[in-house]
């Protein structure tokens, strides 16, 4: 279990997170949602030890700050919003970087398995810089999967931290990536994903954390968090949530959204 207790972050002179508390469970996909500048990425970067913070973050009861970098690398893998590679690496070389960080390097075929999992079999010899943005994003996901391929190792759950994992993808590959996240969680691992697409969040998340202005506005199951009132408050526009008869799955109708004023413009990107 990953617990976040009273996390505060200041970037420069600007307070970004204000006393965030949240819990993420292994076996679940936890989605962090909110308007641009709400603090989603900052919170994720605090949880991955990339951003200084005050407060406490615990992984399976141990303070995350007490872990050595190599220990964290065997327990969790991070997919950032964007990854720039300056050198002309092939796709296979990029995915192999995940083996250097994790503990699954003994499986020589693992990079190929990871590429197959993201639908990129046969791309091993291509240069990363020659791929489309969506293909590069899937290569990076394959690298992350190779790092923590087994969702549970030595009896301990491992974690995927995904920052907008479907931002560059078409709808088919969006579904594929979210299914990978769900499958990883069902295998006993934990997944924490920053999401913008509320419909995908409703479809795939087990737990939703809704941020607004650097604070946790609501947390719980999608149906508990994603209500007309709460989402409209968070996003500063009128939103209508609907449920489809089969399975009562929550979904939104974006074409019914109406601006209610400049509630969230000119905010720091989250």
Swiss-Prot record:
Sequence positions that bind ATP: 34-41
ABC transporter domain sequence ranges: 2-238
One Pfam family of this chain: ABC_tran
Top-level class of the enzyme under EC nomenclature: translocase
Origin: domain of life: Bacteria
GO molecular function: ATP binding; ATP hydrolysis activity
Gene3D superfamilies from the UniProt entry: P-loop containing nucleotide triphosphate hydrolases
UniProt KW Membrane keyword: yes
Subcellular location: Cell inner membrane
Main subcellular localisation: membrane
Keywords assigned by UniProt, alphabetized: ATP-binding, Cell inner membrane, Cell membrane, Membrane, Nucleotide-binding, Translocase, Transport
EC number(s) stated in the UniProt entry for this protein: 7.6.2.-
Function of the molecule: Part of the ABC transporter complex HmuTUV involved in hemin import. Responsible for energy coupling to the transport system.
Complexes and interactors: The complex is composed of two ATP-binding proteins (HmuV), two transmembrane proteins (HmuU) and a solute-binding protein (HmuT).
Name the UniProt record assigns to this protein: Hemin import ATP-binding protein HmuV
Organism in which the protein naturally occurs: Jannaschia sp. (strain CCS1)
Lineage of the species this protein comes from: Bacteria, Pseudomonadati, Pseudomonadota, Alphaproteobacteria, Rhodobacterales
Gene name in the database record: hmuV
